[in-house]
Amino acid sequence: MKPSVYDFTLKELSQLLKPSFRAKQLYLWLYAKYKTSFKDMQNNFSKDFIASLEQEFVLRTIEITHVSHSVDGSKKYLFKSLKDNHTFEAVFLKMKDKKIDEETNAILEGEKYTVCVSCQIGCQVGCSFCFTQKGGFVRNLKASEIIQQALLIKEDNNLPIEKALNIVFMGMGEPLNNLDEVCKAIEIFNTGMQISPKRITISTSGVADKIPILAEKNLGVQLAISLHAVDDKTRSSLIPLNKKYNIECVLNEVKKWPLEQRKRVMFEYLLIKNLNDSLNCAKKLLKLLNGIKSKVNLILFNPHEGSKFERPSLESARMFADFLNSKGLLCTIRESKALDIEAACGQLREKKL
């Protein structure tokens, strides 16, 4: 199968296409005008050039096969690879957004949009609380397949070209186990879809030896660590990878992560009833993160079929958060979106068509 044109960075296309300025023109057609056929690019491309593009590349390599709609406005997308028919999911999230008008000081209300993308079909990490791992690991997604998730979702929701998206690598898969394709996708998000790296978050279960490699690339993205426990015994029961990279090992690498002024590393902490949601756990978490510029994002466990875990009460989550905030550690509780369509954290999976 010919490569997808979405797999190429602007620099790579500039080296492949002659004259090289054609690369920028092609990028505009792809990412600013959503063109899905080379024949639709005839305004400034000759028939011969279009024929050469058709000979070298394909465009779309995935398609939307189903969309689930949540009462909160979120949507879960089931994508199918046109190459091997494997499926994977991504989520479109709508959030309320408030801004202050600099001239009038009036509060302006609007919406901000986040796409939670997948980077693998299945996952190798095998977190016990996550539904994705039940299907095992199939393969890595190409950069083009990651990019097309955001493109197709933006197109399906009729969002203006200029409307910025937030991208979070929190769907199916471990981003650091597909680092090359993830980094290429981030570059294309930036130069193609004009998404600032500051709007992109990479969430990892703690592949400690890949964190410095990501840091060296200096992409300017937000780093999020799926911590979920304050001791190695509990964390290993939740995240088997912890047996290889324990909490101390992960935190040592996080301490070296380059941070801009006023930026913090995000630690995601999944609250599970009677396992890691006590005030004593909050105290241990405070001690663990001492000296790290960090913020904690609490996630209430999202139930799924066959899970042995239970969701804690919102009251216990608030007590946990209030304690950390009172001690100066910024802590928020993530609003669970799309629970009614099984699209919340830890609920995505491959589906057989």
Curated annotation (Swiss-Prot):
Cofactor remark: Binds 1 [4Fe-4S] cluster. The cluster is coordinated with 3 cysteines and an exchangeable S-adenosyl-L-methionine.
Binding site for [4Fe-4S] cluster: C123, C127, C130
Cofactors demanded by this protein: [4Fe-4S] cluster
Location(s), subcellular: Cytoplasm
Gene3D superfamilies documented for this protein: 1.10.150.530, Aldolase class I
Limits of the Radical SAM core domain: 109-340
Domain of life: Bacteria
GO-annotated cellular components: cytoplasm
General remark: Reaction proceeds by a ping-pong mechanism involving intermediate methylation of a conserved cysteine residue.
This protein's name: Dual-specificity RNA methyltransferase RlmN
Lineage: Bacteria, Pseudomonadati, Campylobacterota, Epsilonproteobacteria, Campylobacterales
